[in-house]
From Swiss-Prot:
Keyword vocabulary terms for this entry: Chromosome, Cytoplasm, Cytoskeleton, DNA damage, DNA repair, DNA-binding, Nucleus, Phosphoprotein
Record's subcellular location: Nucleus; Chromosome; Cytoplasm, Cytoskeleton, Microtubule organizing center, Centrosome; Cytoplasm, Cytoskeleton, Spindle pole
Keyword Hydrolase: no
Biased segments, Polar residues type: 71-91
GO molecular function: damaged DNA binding
Quaternary structure and interacting proteins, as annotated: Interacts (via C-terminus) with AURKA (via C-terminus). Interacts (via N-terminus) with NIN; this interaction blocks NIN phosphorylation by both AURKA and GSK3B. Identified in a complex with NIN and AURKA. Interacts with RBBP8/CtIP.
Protein known as: Aurora kinase A- and ninein-interacting protein
Pfam families in the cross-refs: AIB (PF15334)
Keyword Nucleotide-binding in annotation: no
Amino acid sequence: MRRTGPEEEACGVWLDAAALKRRKVQTHLIKPGTKMLTLLPGERKANIYFTQRRAPSTGIHQRSIASFFTLQPGKTNGSDQKSVSSHTESQINKESKKNATQLDHLIPGLAHDCMASPLATSTTADIQEAGLSPQSLQTSGHHRMKTPFSTELSLLQPDTPDCAGDSHTPLAFSFTEDLESSCLLDRKEEKGDSARKWEWLHESKKNYQSMEKHTKLPGDKCCQPLGKTKLERKVSAKENRQAPVLLQTYRESWNGENIESVKQSRSPVSVFSWDNEKNDKDSWSQLFTEDSQGQRVIAHNTRAPFQDVTNNWNWDLGPFPNSPWAQCQEDGPTQNLKPDLLFTQDSEGNQVIRHQF
């Protein structure tokens, strides 16, 4: 007999076939090149493949990042990739042509003196994108020194026909208006400067003519007949005879005054030198004194204030002998120079100099 009970109990896991059929099983693996997107329920998955072409097709130049990526809505075929790349390249070519036509319509409207060269800051890649050929660049290089404006205009004219609708864009219109207004302002300033210069020259000429008139006037006054000048000379000769006598008397009086002033100025100098010697002796007498044994010692006059004796040029009388200031100075040093104030006795009875702190 078969024993099914213990074997079924040993497994412990019961599998329902109907539940397994209902569950969805992932049959295909996720490719590493696909991009995972979080989709809401009801949305479809977008099959976007970011694959880079290793070998680009001949005759197609890679100009943008969009040429690296191809959008594959359905099947992945070589024909689909070519169609997508050609579509992106055609869009890029259209944009470059539009830019070239806008430049072609903008530049003829500008003034000749305010135009700046657009090719001065452009690179070779930008020129190639604009549809310019290298031959036209070479011709512009040869004729740049002679006629730069005409060659640059010829360079910026593309092979495509002109679009009348693009030339009247608001951006281009405002750009040309701003440039024209700036050019008009520059011209007005130049005219104003030239007018100022003309006025300045006109005024300088007037001033020069007026100066010439003023210089000619004194010359006309001096031109007088000879008869009058002779008469005036005779009269002036009589006056000149009396003039030397007056000059001599004036000179003598002036010399006498100078001699007296010199004599008066010399006398105080000698007095001043004698007073200086006396002041020196008085200053020595104030600095030094004699002790009880007759020896010369330094005089310590601590109680008396400091006095500037050198500036007092007359010690006996002073500049004002009757003034109280001179009397105080005469009495001051004699009263302060006393032996009791200068000397004292120590513990052994010896006489020593008094030190007051």
